[in-house]
Amino acid sequence: MSRIHPTAIVEPGAQLDESVEVGPYAVIGAHVTIGARTTVGSHSVIEGHTTLGEDNRIGHYASVGGRPQDMKYKDEPTRLVIGSRNTIREFTTIHTGTVQDSGVTTLGDDNWIMAYVHIGHDCHVGNNVILSSNAQMAGHVIIGDHAIVGGMSGVHQFVRIGAHSMLGGASALVQDIPPFVIAAGNKAEPHGINVEGLRRRGFSPDAISALRAAYRVLYKNGLSLEEAKVQLRELASAGGDGDEPVQTLLAFVEASQRGIIR
């Protein structure tokens, strides 16, 4: 049987695995589903059409599944889907999607969401992402796997943060960060390849060397973006361990709608 504190409120219709723990004064809404071994801290609110997987830890006073901060929202039954093994610390806010987008906000698996983080409507956060304290994601932001966002940073709506990239603390990001790149500042500018992070995740020396070469093409050689794309295509077909990550970088750049940081 679920271990629910007597002061907590679980509305009829909520579906909680029998191993879920709910702390004092927490509120669980009628359309919420919570998977096995998840713990919900005291005074937290999980509402809306929200689904959580297994082994999540929700800190006290977190607000999960709240209404989108979008004036066009008209009480449509939009959703929030959270995977498994996420840590969501105290006072974090995560909102459901809007019908103007896909109607769903998503958070993958194994993410570390620190205190006071905001994840706005229609955001899509991948796996193994770290969002440091007070990082603020506007609506429609997409964050790739293994990305890190520093504390006190603000991310503009519709911005994409590429996989394995890192945004330094107290930064203001208004355009896309390509995968594997370090960025920082107000406004955020590129500061090299995330070499240490790539080493920790098992990228080969050849792959890292290829990404460094790609970074020089994109940022150091004085090329226009279109000129840089031509050279990146050549690097992406050189043969070796570097081809796949350079292809990933190139595909991200070519798909950018807001433009990449430069």
Swiss-Prot record:
Compartments, as annotated in UniProt: Cytoplasm
GO MF entries: acyl-[acyl-carrier-protein]-UDP-N-acetylglucosamine O-acyltransferase activity
GO biological process, one term: lipid A biosynthetic process
Entry keywords, A to Z: Acyltransferase, Cytoplasm, Lipid A biosynthesis, Lipid biosynthesis, Lipid metabolism, Repeat, Transferase
Pathway recorded for this protein: Glycolipid biosynthesis; lipid IV(A) biosynthesis; lipid IV(A) from (3R)-3-hydroxytetradecanoyl-[acyl-carrier-protein] and UDP-N-acetyl-alpha-D-glucosamine: step 1/6
Organism superkingdom: Bacteria
CDD domains registered for this protein in UniProt: LbH_UDP-GlcNAc_AT
Keyword ATP-binding: no
Keyword Metal-binding: no
Catalytic activity, as annotated: a (3R)-hydroxyacyl-[ACP] + UDP-N-acetyl-alpha-D-glucosamine = a UDP-3-O-[(3R)-3-hydroxyacyl]-N-acetyl-alpha-D-glucosamine + holo-[ACP]
UniProt subunit comment: Homotrimer.
Functional note: Involved in the biosynthesis of lipid A, a phosphorylated glycolipid that anchors the lipopolysaccharide to the outer membrane of the cell.
UniProt protein name: Acyl-[acyl-carrier-protein]--UDP-N-acetylglucosamine O-acyltransferase
Designated gene of the protein: lpxA
